[in-house]
Structure formats: structure tokens, C-alpha cells
Amino acid sequence: ANGGAGKVIQRSKIIVEQDSMLKAMMIACRHANGKDWWLVKQMYEYSPGNLKSKNKIATFLVTKDSVYPPVITYFQDFLFSDYDQAGQAIFNQDGTKYAATCRGTNKVFLADFDRCTGIFSNPKTYNVPNYSCHNPNDSSWVDSFTHGLEFSPSTQFLYISKSYNILQLDITDNDSATAWYHVAGLDTAWNYFPKYSRLSIGYDNKVYLGYVGAIRNTMSHI
């Protein structure tokens, strides 16, 4: 439409009723057919005066003609508790693994993804270790803010950014004592450090890292 520039041809189409979706952590993954896309959002249940995350993920099939009602995957594991918190959701490079984290939960959610059906399986929730943020007045709750995450090119490792630390999780290692590795912490005094932010893999297969507030004109990479 619009000479290839795009155009809104339908609006206000209701595709989800009764349930609502989390504000953050929307991500897309190409369908196995190579043409269509899956749009993925976590959901929350609403009751008057209470917002609570449900243990399910909605996957919408997006084609060139329409957006279809979601495929719903239910989980026993509790996901994230606050719909209004920031976070990040990602797929690995071949779209077979999904991971998500939400600021303030100090948890990482991991699952397999079927690009043919849009269904998740084999869910697992990790508790992210805390490290001292070197703030004598506040050494715990700030570092529980898991801001972002990204897979390594091989998918063996998952990198997680916290306010003052970068961690590596070996998802093939079932021993929590050896699966975690501390990659980086502060490179200056805590009160001058801008805090780590989202992660994203580049075309060069390096994992790039931003900073909260964007007060630096540079990025780091792993």
C-alpha cells in the first residue's frame, strides 16, 4: 500500500478480549514458512484494583493480509508480576529459543519455540544471582533490576544485564553453581555509573550493550 511506504488499512480491530497484554517485551519471530511472522506478547489478568501477570504467552500470526487471534501457551511457572515494568524479550538467531526478563523480578524465563505452530515448550525459570553494586546505602534492590538479555551466536550462553553487572548463563549447564559467570561490573564509582541497559546482537555476532539514560556516546560489546 501507499507505493511501498506502508498505510494503515484497518484499525481498532479487536483480537484479544477479556485478557490484556504486558506493556513491554513484545518481540517478533519469522514463521517457518519464511513469509509470515509470529508476534509474541506476555499477558496479564485484570480484576478491579489488581493487576497480576498470568502464566501464559500469546502468539499472533501476522500475514500480509491479516493479524490472527493468538495461539496461547500456558505455563506452570510463574512469569512476571507487574505489567507496567520494563523488560526485554528475545529469540535466538534461528528462532527456536525464547527468553525474557522483567526489571525488578531478578528472574529469567527460557523456553523452546516452534516456528510452525507458534507454541512454546520446555519452560524454565532462573533466579539471577546478585552482586554488590558498591553502594553502601543500597547494596541489593538496585542490582535486582534485570534490564535486558541476549543469546550468544551459538545459543549456548545467555547474557543478562543488571544495573551494575553483566552475567553469562550457560543454558546447557544444569548446575546453578557453575552455570553462571560474572562478565563485568562497575568501571567507575557506583554513583557516577550510568547503569547497564538493553542488549542486542549485531550482524558481526557481537553482543552490544547500551546504558540507561544514554548519557554516554559509546556502546560496549561482549
Spans of model-derived segments:
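Beta-propeller fold recognition
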Residues: 1-113, 119-222
